[in-house]
Every structure is written in C-alpha cells, then in structure tokens.
Swiss-Prot record:
<dbReference type="InterPro" id="IPR045864">
    <property type="entry name" value="aa-tRNA-synth_II/BPL/LPL"/>
</dbReference>
<keyword id="KW-0808">Transferase</keyword>
<dbReference type="GO" id="GO:0036211">
    <property type="term" value="P:protein modification process"/>
</dbReference>
<comment type="pathway">
    <text>Protein modification; protein lipoylation via endogenous pathway; protein N(6)-(lipoyl)lysine from octanoyl-[acyl-carrier-protein]: step 1/2.</text>
</comment>
<feature type="binding site">
    <location>
        <begin position="65"/>
        <end position="72"/>
    </location>
    <ligand>
        <name>substrate</name>
    </ligand>
</feature>
<feature type="site" description="Lowers pKa of active site Cys">
    <location>
        <position position="126"/>
    </location>
</feature>
<dbReference type="InterPro" id="IPR004143">
    <property type="entry name" value="BPL_LPL_catalytic"/>
</dbReference>
<keyword id="KW-0963">Cytoplasm</keyword>
<protein>
    <recommendedName>
        <fullName>Probable octanoyltransferase</fullName>
        <ecNumber>2.3.1.181</ecNumber>
    </recommendedName>
</protein>
<keyword id="KW-0012">Acyltransferase</keyword>
<feature type="binding site">
    <location>
        <begin position="129"/>
        <end position="131"/>
    </location>
    <ligand>
        <name>substrate</name>
    </ligand>
</feature>
<feature type="domain" description="BPL/LPL catalytic">
    <location>
        <begin position="27"/>
        <end position="198"/>
    </location>
</feature>
<feature type="active site" description="Acyl-thioester intermediate">
    <location>
        <position position="160"/>
    </location>
</feature>
<dbReference type="InterPro" id="IPR020605">
    <property type="entry name" value="Octanoyltransferase_CS"/>
</dbReference>
<dbReference type="GO" id="GO:0033819">
    <property type="term" value="F:lipoyl(octanoyl) transferase activity"/>
</dbReference>
<dbReference type="GO" id="GO:0005737">
    <property type="term" value="C:cytoplasm"/>
</dbReference>
<dbReference type="Pfam" id="PF21948">
    <property type="entry name" value="LplA-B_cat"/>
</dbReference>
Length: 228
C-alpha cells in the first residue's frame, strides 16, 4: 500500500489528491494511504444537514462522504485510505475504528465503540470521527483523530449531530503526545488491522498533479478575509 505523508495541507489539495488516487486504484493501481493535518476547515457529508453548522466563520465544504458536519484543524491526525473495498462496508468501518482503538492502547487509553454512533469513544466522549465514500468499488475519505486539537472549534458545529462537549482529544484525556509521535502508533495499528504494509512514497508528484485539477468540493462558506 502506497503511503503519502502530506504534513499540514489545505483541505482542497488533499481532496484533489484523493480523487487522483481514487482514479488510479479504480483502474487497478495499488491501494493508497494518506496522512495529513489540515488548517481549520468544516466539512459536511453529502446527506448531512447544513444547519449543523452554527458558526460560518471557517471554510465550509460539502463532500461525498457519509456523516454530518465535522471539523478538521491543527493537532488532528487525518487518515484517508483509498482502497479497493474487499470487505462488507460495515466491516470496513469497523476496521477503521479498530485501528484507532489499537493505536491508543500503548498510551493507556481504553477506547471503544458506542451503539448508534460511528467513531471511537473514551469515557462517553468521541475522540475520533469516521466518514467515507465508496465509488466504483473503491473507498476513500476516512478517519480523524483528535490529538492536541483545539476543541473550541467544534463549537462552530453540532459535530455529527452531537453537542460539542461530547468531543475530546488525547491531550484533554491527559495524554501528552505530539501528532508526529501518535502518527507512528496509528500507522502500526492500521497495518496490523488491515494486514498491509505501508510503503512511503514521495508525495511531490501527486501534489503537482493535484495543483493542476480544477475540480473542488462544493464551497458553502469562506472566511471574510479569504473572500475579499
């Protein structure tokens, strides 16, 4: 499985890269795995409700994934596997959750699932969100884990229909770990659950190709300073 570590990258560029990789995988190419940290942004799933965005102060996009409104920002690790869907959809979602759950065990964090809500939970609070899309038998979008995220930004939304106070982070749970340190734990757990080896490749050609694309997710709102 190809791995691309993009560091801090705007949402649209990462979305375009997902589109490029999706096309490659659908055409028979190797599966891919993106790791990224986004600047402040809100995305809403295609069947989500825009009234779950309560403060229109950030970039807000409607995207193909399932789920409702969510926030991405600094201190949050986002993983976008772009993979041929070899499993039932419910199993694939379980595997994404399981990768997060296993990644937290070395930190002494006992995480799990809750009935009726996707994602990963600790003590009744959500530490990771999941939302995917499937087109042509290939899954993309993925999972976001709050490591040192500024949780105040979740008050811009009702995250997946929840009250913002239901969201937590590793730092809030008392785990002092950097995004880079956690990244290694997550990759190890992901490889274990998916029985795959991530082989890291240079993202530069993909970033260059993404920069040439004109397609973008649907923009609902932009910060005033970005739109003037």
């Amino acid at each position: 499985m190809r791995g691309l570590d993009l560091g801090l990258l705007d949402y649209v560029s990462a979305w375009r890269m997902m589109k490029i990789l999706h096309r490659e995988v659908a055409s028979g190419g190797d599966d891919a795995f993106i790791l990224v940290e986004h600047p402040h942004v809100i995305t809403v799933g295609k069947h989500g409700r825009t009234n779950n965005v309560v403060k229109w102060e950030l970039f807000v996009y409607v995207v193909e994934r399932g789920g409702d409104a969510t926030y991405h920002g600094p201190g949050q690790l986002v993983a976008y596997p772009v993979v041929k869907l070899r499993w039932p959809l419910s199993r694939y979602l379980w595997m994404l959750e399981e990768a997060v759950i296993r990644s937290l065990r070395p930190l002494g964090v006992e995480a799990g699932r809750v009935e009726k809500h996707r994602g990963v939970w600790v003590g009744g609070k959500k530490v990771a969100s999941i939302g995917i899309a499937v087109e042509g038998g290939v899954a993309y979008h993925g999972v976001a884990v709050n490591v040192s995220t500024d949780l105040s930004y979740f008050y811009h939304i009702n995250p997946c229909g929840l009250h913002p106070s239901a969201i937590t982070s590793l730092n809030q749970l008392g785990v002092e770990i950097s995004l880079e340190e956690y990244k290694g734990l997550f990759v190890e757990a992901f490889e274990e659950v998916f029985e795959a080896k991530v082989v890291w490749v240079d993202p530069a050609p993909y970033l260059a190709a993404a920069a040439q694309l004109r397609a973008s997710p649907t923009l609902l709102s932009a910060p005033i300073e970005a739109s003037t």
